[in-house]
Amino acid sequence: LKTLGLCLSFAGWMYWFKRWLRVDFCFVPAAVFSAASVAVYFGGILFRLEYAAWLVYAGGLAAFAAAAAFSLARRARPAVHLGLREICFGIGCAVFLSILPGAHFQHYDNFSHWGIVVKLMLSTNAFPTAQSGLIDFLNYPLGTSSFLYYVCYYAGRREGTMLLAQGILIFAFFYAVLGAVRHTRCFLLYALLGAGLSLLSFFNITIRINNLLVDFLLPVIALACWAVIRRYPTDPEKMLPLLLPYQALLL
């Protein structure tokens, strides 16, 4: 039930974010995930990590309930139109992400830092400190770790759940890159972008998708920022609210 609630919470935030900004839905999931990560991160800085996770979760559920009531009252159309772009992208995501729920950590850095950090956050509901003997590297920011903590707090603490959360975050920014295409009927451009992103994932031998390293995520976020700027170069009311959470997570 908590996992279902997590999905509904994200859906609630996405609905109102899309309705508020009126942007291409490609940019919305990454913006919501980034904003949730930053909110949980600031909660951790204020020593209220668990409270921040509950606040984001409860706020999303309230947003979903309000969205459902609003849609039923006004018989509004769905916020997302499932076109060929969404169907093909969803199939591609399913292919890549289907292996992750039962996967295990393999890369050394998962055991020396990233996986240990998230496990420690889930155990203590707090950020690690300089006195945490399990953490070898103390200079890495905890932006993506905050997102993994938030998802795993409700969806489970297995390694596969952490890897799935990381994969969903990566593909949310992949999806945002598709928003660079202004003409939604130019399927060939979407196909070329999708093929390029798929090849990046497939041939990235050093940093596979079954690890928590951010080395692959950071350039994808940068590409998503480029896509926003290219799509809305003269519309700061749409560009800035999207770039703010993207770049906050990037930093």
Spell out what each predicted region is.
Residues A39-G44, M239-L251:
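Membrane-interface alpha helices of multi-pass inner-membrane proteins
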Residues A67, G83-Y108, L200-S201:
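Transmembrane signal-anchor helices characteristic of membrane glycosylation enzymes that use polyprenol
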